[in-house]
Amino acid sequence: MSAGIRTYLELMRYKNCLMAGFAAAIGTLIAFNILISGTSTPNFEDAFPFLDAGLVFLVVFLVSGAGNAINDYFDIKIDSINRPERPIPSGRVKAKEAFYFSYLLFALGTLIAFSINSICGSIALFNSLLLILYAKTLKGTPLLGNLSIGYLTGSVFLFGASIFGFGGIKALSVLFLLAALAITAREIVKDIEDMEGDSLEGADTLPLRIGAKKAGYLAVLTGLLAVILSPLPYFMSVLGLRYIYLVSLADLGFLAAIIQLLVRNNPTKSSKLFKIAMFFALIAFIAGV
């Protein structure tokens, strides 16, 4: 490979990969605490599996980096106009090198995931294939692209829990659903925010297909569903009272984001508020165990 390590790390968007890896490790921690608290009957030792949690972090880091690299490979034309400084359009990484590099990362991540257990491996393989499909096709498909990002981001927590088998997945399934709904809503809002630029680039997004107003209603509906379902982890005895207190702050943030979109027609502010609300939701997940 002709490019240096720093260039390939840039291609991976390593900072985002680090955050995704930490999120997966948090998923492992939350699932462990839920299972060990006696709300389920796990078949594993009481000691926290630090090695497997480290492998979970590594897998998500690699697969996320692969997804970013393959995304840049398919976005060469757009990035040459909008992001000419990126590794591929700037000529620092050849397109073929980026392509092979992404598949190498996908393969490494999936193999490591299968070394943890078959459930981890299956999720890693499915997500890798979905990331490739997203970069090639789904990214330009209205709604399906938004749903894909919602699933992929939410599944990071689910993947972290999967080291405990189906018991771990069951423990975090509601949290995965809430995260996926909130992220899908924000993705739609981001598309509304980017309508002008996407229109100039000839992109086919949900707001451009059905209009900003209808897309906004769908984002509001999805966000409200996340808010309405947010108490479920408490009522299902998955998380404790601290979760309710903190998730209430997140819910206020989501409602503020909805108001900015629906009443004030400000998708930029709405998108920022969604992001802040999701941060509080993550804190609620961690503290609520």
From Swiss-Prot:
Name the needed cofactors.
Mg(2+)
The record's Gene Ontology cellular component field reads: plasma membrane
Q: Can you cite a GO biological process for this protein?
A: glycerophospholipid biosynthetic process
Q: Which reaction does it catalyse?
A: sn-3-O-(geranylgeranyl)glycerol 1-phosphate + (2E,6E,10E)-geranylgeranyl diphosphate = 2,3-bis-O-(geranylgeranyl)-sn-glycerol 1-phosphate + diphosphate
Keyword annotations from UniProtKB, A to Z? Cell membrane, Lipid biosynthesis, Lipid metabolism, Magnesium, Membrane, Phospholipid biosynthesis, Phospholipid metabolism, Transferase, Transmembrane, Transmembrane helix
Functional pathway: Membrane lipid metabolism; glycerophospholipid metabolism
* A Pfam family of this chain: UbiA
Membrane-spanning ranges:
18-38, 47-67, 99-119, 120-140, 163-183, 218-238, 243-263, 269-289
MF (Gene Ontology): geranylgeranylglycerol-phosphate geranylgeranyltransferase activity; magnesium ion binding
Q: Where in the cell is it found?
A: Cell membrane
Function, in words? Prenyltransferase that catalyzes the transfer of the geranylgeranyl moiety of geranylgeranyl diphosphate (GGPP) to the C2 hydroxyl of (S)-3-O-geranylgeranylglyceryl phosphate (GGGP). This reaction is the second ether-bond-formation step in the biosynthesis of archaeal membrane lipids.
Q: What is this protein called?
A: Digeranylgeranylglyceryl phosphate synthase
Q: Which organism is it from?
A: Methanosarcina mazei (strain ATCC BAA-159 / DSM 3647 / Goe1 / Go1 / JCM 11833 / OCM 88)
Q: What is the lineage of its organism?
A: Archaea, Methanobacteriati, Methanobacteriota, Stenosarchaea group, Methanomicrobia
